[in-house]
Regions:
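Short amphipathic
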Residues: 2-10
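Short, low-complexity Ser/Thr-rich regulatory SLiMs
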Residues: 62-63, 76
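Amphipathic, hydrophobic secondary-structure cores in small proteins
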Residues: 9-61
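Short acidic/glycine-enriched loop/turn segments that link adjacent beta-strands
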Residues: 65-67
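Core SAM-dependent methyltransferase catalytic element
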Residues: 70-78
Length: 78
């Protein structure tokens, strides 16, 4: 397991970015972060809902030049 990871899901439509992020979070240690890069505008709403439902913390959500960047912390941090 790693302390942090980046997942590039640019070009994919929802729900694929959230599904792939959920799978990627299993590969990072509890308390570690996953940065997700997406281009689907619906991803902002989807990642907020995903965070609420799963308990993974959405640390930030930003957009720059059409790329959405989400930073999630895997639940279970010490």
């Amino acid at each position: 397991m790693t302390d942090s990871a980046t997942l590039d899901v640019q070009g994919l439509s929802c729900p694929l970015p959230v599904l792939k992020a959920n799978k990627a979070l299993r590969g990072v240690a509890p308390g570690a972060t996953l940065t997700v890069l997406a281009t689907d505008p619906a991803a902002a709403k989807d990642f907020a809902a995903f965070s609420e439902e799963t308990g993974h913390e959405l640390l930030s959500s930003t957009a720059e030049a059409g790329v959405l960047r989400f930073v999630l912390r895997r639940r279970g941090a010490p």
